[in-house]
Amino acid sequence: KMDQIIAGTIINILATGLTSFFYSQGYVLPAITPKLRIPILADIPLIGPVFFDNGLFTYAALFTALLLWVLLFKTIWGLRTRSVGEKPGSADTSGINVQRTRFINVTLAGALAGLAGAYLSIEAASTFERGLTAGRGFTALAIMIFGAWNPIGAMAAAFFFGLANGVASQLQADEVIAIPQPFIHMLPYILTILLLAIVSGRIDPPASLGNPYPFDFAS
């Protein structure tokens, strides 16, 4: 029944502490995942290396975004999921268990967030250290908003953020522009602030987002 933003912040801090603890105990030994290059398609200029020359996690992320769009907007499960976020009272009246539906979906979302962290340590960086995510999870919240709570929109927004960060890093590596390293780390968050300022008030979130629904012991 507590405020969901506060609960999420507590869980986030707990997760940070747990990863630091297990890392200090020597329990973490990430393995490098091999790249899966798709012949012919990977040779397409510009888009080939982006979409067809990646590791398993990248392909899984692209597939998951498409799958979630189908599930959310083309299935009964998706209709129920959206209803408990928009009008939980009406969903409850129609016989949908609001608490259970929300719990299952939040659990699935947490699992996907965990896979995103695994991508950073296993596929992208091939190592693990404290603070590896550098707050990228909060950028993901901005991506979700910028994508209008739509998996395809969020994927497009993620491409935009990744492209901007990648271009800045490449310019620095090639010494085309003398960009201080701290600014490179700041860039995703500067973009987040700018984009949120632009889209704020133009994109409507789910009506009951973050609002706990009264628990019914009879359910």
Positions of PLM-derived features:
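Alpha-helical transmembrane segments within multi-pass membrane transporters and channels
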Residues: 1-16, 66, 160, 165
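Hydrophobic core segments of alpha-helical transmembrane domains in multi-pass membrane transport
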Residues: 16-20, 58-71, 109-117, 140-143, ...
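Cytosolic-side transmembrane-helix boundaries in multi-pass membrane proteins
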Residues: 86, 92-93, 97-100, 171-219
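Transmembrane alpha-helical segments in multi-pass inner-membrane proteins
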Residues: 124-189
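Transmembrane helix-bundle core of multi-pass membrane transporters
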Residues: 4, 15-74, 175-184, 210-219
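Hydrophobic alpha-helical membrane-insertion segments
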Residues: 8-24, 144-151
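Helix-loop-helix "hairpin" substructures at the membrane interface of multi-pass membrane proteins
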Residues: 50-128, 151-152, 156
